[in-house]
Amino acid sequence: MPEPRSGARRPLSRRTALAATAAGLGGALTAGLAGCSTASGGTGGGVSLTFTWWGNDDRAARTKKAVRLFEKEHPGVTVRTSNAEFGAYKQKLATQAAGGGIPDVAQLDYRQISQYAGGGALLRLDEAFDKEQIRTAEMDPSFLRTGRYAGKQYAVPMGRGITGYAYDASVYKKAGVPAPGPGWTWQDFTDVNRRIAALGLTSPDGRPFTGSNDGGGNEDVFEDWLRGRGGRLYASQTRLGFTEDDLSEFWTFCDRLRKEGLVAAARDSTQAKSTETSPMGRGLAAADFTWDAPFPGYPALLGDAVHFAPVPTTGGHQGAYFKPSMLLGVGAHSAHPAQAVALVDFLLNDPRAGDILGFTRSTPPNRTIAARVATTLEGAEREIYDYAQTMEKYGLDAPPSAPPRGDVPVQIAFGRAYQRVMFEKATPRQAARELIDEAHRELRS
């Protein structure tokens, strides 16, 4: 992966940061701010910002603590915060966007960038990048492009995540198979799961214990499989990057594994909504496809024998890439874009904010802050940091830009189509054809 530019700068004082940001955004981003109100959002001449995100209680407490530090460093600026669970958050943000504007600063999912940038809800940040009002010298340039839409920057990654494979090393040892590692293949995956199934173990409710969950309905797993073969999910904002043959081959592979009893049964995969309800969490499988951020939940639930490994490869070519666990964007209609940009920069680049936020949003994109915080990590959190370092040295392909606006309904349709395969309502070929037809309609609508 490209190395970040050298020459990291010291944190700016609050006066310097706000003065530089206000000057730059006041003039250079005039076009991006056209039509925005300039009235104060606070009282007595002060500035009031809104900042919203999704996440658990720990993330909320840490984020609020970092925001209070920002307020202390910027007298006259207050930040009203709010957070919710992901489903409710997505719905509320969509309602706000439709009603006139999202908050001054909003946490965004990778799949939301095209939706809100294309809909005019996000402020362009190119000028803020160019003038270092949002400092990026300690961030990977190829990773930053995940916040781009139509060639312009609309969001900044707040955490760097990567797909992986949680597995129970004690079961692998019992089966006499090696632990998965960089370069292991889908054929290895099949062989290992066959050995585990042959142990004849049973779940707590007496059903056969399998090698892993069924990744067939998971678009992230398919993307890793596809990229490992040189493909991609999207060729453009309106075109898929894969064919019916590609998807049919993947689903045929997954379907065969399930029918042979090597991966979890259909009903168990469809019931998986969390770590606890996954086949692995329920004692039905030895492994699970997941992301680095939620991985610590597996050893917390199942014990320290659970570790994190790469997703299988095709011929040793890794399809995984570093993806933003979430991003920060500024509302296009913010009355105080300068201060909103200053808050974004503070959360990403201030070492004290980095210490407070830690790895609550996965690995911080600022490499210096990530290395600093990593010295305090233990257990599963340290394992995912070391895993990310290993994968970076392994040589991953650059991440794609944000998915197109139709990606969310395509993702939902993907899981629904594979369920038809699992419950024998369609063949892999039929389901692939149906999914591609539906995806074309969504992308062109």
Regions found by a protein language model. Give the residues of each.
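Extracytoplasmic/periplasmic substrate-recognition and gating elements
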Residues: 72, 175, 259-263, 299-363, ...
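Conserved C-terminal helix/tail region of periplasmic/extracytoplasmic solute-binding proteins
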Residues: 2-5, 10, 173, 394-445
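Mature extracytoplasmic/periplasmic domains
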Residues: 293-296, 331-408, 429
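Hinge/lid segment of periplasmic solute-binding proteins
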Residues: 111-162, 307-309, 377, 382
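Extracytoplasmic "Venus flytrap"/periplasmic binding protein-like
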Residues: 69-138, 173-176, 278-287, 441
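Extracytoplasmic/periplasmic solute-binding protein
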Residues: 154-158, 163, 187-241, 285
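Glycine-centered hinge/linker elements that transmit conformational signals in sensory
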Residues: 193, 237-268
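A structural signal for short loop-to-beta-strand junctions that line the ligand-binding cleft
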Residues: 103-104, 135-171, 318-320, 394-404
